[in-house]
């Protein structure tokens, strides 16, 4: 049996039917890590010994009825900004190189209760600030489809691990597209849920009003099943929502007849790569052939989305990252004169360039002379963007957009021009500004064989519309193929 061809749900079903053991799946994943990790570098840390022990424990639990869920026994990787008790959590930053949390994030407790097996921690852009996983203090992650290209970011390690077969499932976090964009680059499926659906307790904060944890998987059904496990109210997170509609899997059918899709015309203007546009338009054609209605409309606030997002996100980041000062935990500069000098040198040496850039931008827009001109204006703009999305959802079930204007850039290209990297988030940031759910599904490849993803955006609490549409499209599209199949490009 080729375990690499199985989805997470299929693997769990084979385990339940006693065709394979939990340990078989875990061993398979570690075999893939051993074979590919030197090239891909998706992980910052792996827990082989603990995972093998956990596999035996879960196997016993499945047999005695303790673990009955649809993903029991499945290996999963965790982005390294999500706390696991007793395991280093670095956020891919030098300043947290030795930070070991004394508690689990809420999502970790839920995964363990559901019988999943945690494989390790994945690489990311430092403090989730970046779109390429190149700002990590611990080296770049490479795209499994072509090792000369980036996997996207900031959840690039999680998406690359799934694409390379180094895990079946992964958790990422999404602040401005950090699950959806790397999912597109790596040819996997990823969803950013409605804000407040998944507890942020134990997620190291970047921008608290925008951050949300979400699943990455091989297909839509895997992501729906994983979201059912991690979603739900948590009293430890003041922004956590009480929701009754957390059965996502039942919404998935092969039919989308009568669904109305909206496409913002501004999302197809200059800057969109022709090959990405062609794949996107072909997807619209497929949806129409399936009986859906696709209409174009104007989203006038599009040009304000990037500036509003980067002002708000950087402002919140500058506040959140004040806690990393070398006093209680993490890196501390070795040589300093007095307390203030220790703060200064610790943060100068501990933070990377991109993080410092965003802290400075955030501090600037929050400063007394510029607060009204920038931060307050950005908040008002955010409200106008949300109003326009509300108007769109009064007419459309789902909005469609490319996940990124281009396919995965070559390593090093994006770091030369940070502004261009920021502009690459044009199609994803509004989802976070408005607290909406969004899913990325592979829809094509460019001439070089790099994946292209389509993004489906839903109204708040309407993930079921996304799962229905994405699953139906996925069935029509057929098999997308696998990265590193028959040897990788290098």
Predicted regions and their residues:
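An N-terminal boundary/leader segment
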Residues: 1-52, 289-291, 482-490
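Residue-level signal for inorganic ion chemistry
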Residues: 29, 51, 104, 223, ...
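Serine-dependent amide/ester hydrolase catalytic core
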Residues: 12-13, 301-302, 325-433, 483-489
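Structural helix-boundary/capping segments
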Residues: 35, 113, 164-169, 173-271, ...
């Amino acid at each position: 049996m080729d375990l690499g061809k199985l989805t997470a749900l299929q693997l769990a079903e084979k385990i339940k039917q006693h065709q394979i053991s939990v340990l078989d799946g875990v061993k398979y994943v570690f075999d893939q890590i051993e074979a590919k990790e030197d090239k891909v570098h998706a992980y910052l840390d792996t827990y082989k010994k603990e995972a093998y022990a956990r596999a035996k424990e879960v196997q016993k639990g499945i047999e005695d009825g303790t673990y009955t869920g649809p993903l029991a026994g499945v290996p999963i990787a965790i982005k390294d900004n999500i706390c696991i008790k007793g395991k280093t959590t670095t956020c891919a930053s030098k300043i947290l190189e030795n930070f070991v949390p004394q508690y689990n994030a809420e999502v970790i407790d839920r995964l363990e209760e559901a019988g999943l097996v945690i494989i390790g921690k994945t690489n990311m852009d430092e403090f989730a600030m970046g779109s390429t996983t190149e700002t990590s203090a611990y080296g770049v992650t490479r795209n499994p489809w072509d090792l000369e290209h980036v996997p996207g970011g900031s959840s690039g390690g999680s998406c690359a691990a799934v694409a390379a077969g180094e895990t079946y499932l992964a958790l990422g976090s999404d602040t401005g597209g950090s699950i959806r964009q790397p999912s597109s680059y790596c040819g996997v499926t990823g969803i950013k849920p409605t804000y407040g659906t998944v507890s942020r307790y134990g997620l190291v904060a970047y921008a608290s009003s925008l951050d949300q944890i979400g699943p990455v998987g091989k297909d839509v059904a895997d992501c729906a099943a994983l979201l059912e496990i991690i979603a739900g109210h948590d009293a430890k997170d003041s922004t956590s929502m009480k929701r009754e509609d957390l059965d996502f899997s039942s919404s998935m059918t092969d039919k989308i007849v009568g669904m109305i899709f909206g496409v913002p015309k501004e999302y197809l203007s200059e800057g969109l790569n022709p090959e990405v546009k062609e794949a996107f338009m072909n997807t619209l054609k497929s949806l129409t052939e399936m009986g859906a209605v696709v209409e174009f409309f104007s989203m006038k606030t599009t040009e304000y989305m990037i500036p509003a997002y980067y002002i708000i996100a950087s402002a919140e980041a500058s506040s959140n990252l004040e806690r990393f000062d070398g006093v209680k935990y993490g890196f501390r500069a070795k040589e300093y004169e007095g307390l203030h000098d220790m703060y200064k040198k610790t943060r100068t040496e501990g933070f990377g360039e991109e993080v410092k850039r965003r802290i400075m931008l955030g501090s600037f827009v929050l400063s007394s002379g510029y607060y009204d001109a920038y931060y307050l204006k950005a908040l008002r703009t955010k409200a106008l963007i949300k109003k326009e999305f509300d108007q769109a959802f009064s007419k459309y079930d789902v909005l469609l957009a490319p996940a990124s204007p281009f396919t995965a850039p070559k390593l090093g290209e994006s770091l030369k021009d940070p502004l261009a990297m920021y502009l690459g988030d044009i199609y994803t940031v509004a989802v976070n500004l408005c607290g909406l759910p969004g899913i990325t599904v592979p829809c094509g490849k460019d001439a070089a064989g790099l994946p292209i993803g389509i993004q489906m955006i839903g109204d708040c609490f309407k993930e079921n519309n996304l799962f229905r549409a994405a699953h139906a499209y996925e069935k029509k599209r057929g098999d997308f193929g696998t990265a590193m199949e028959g040897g990788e490009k290098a």
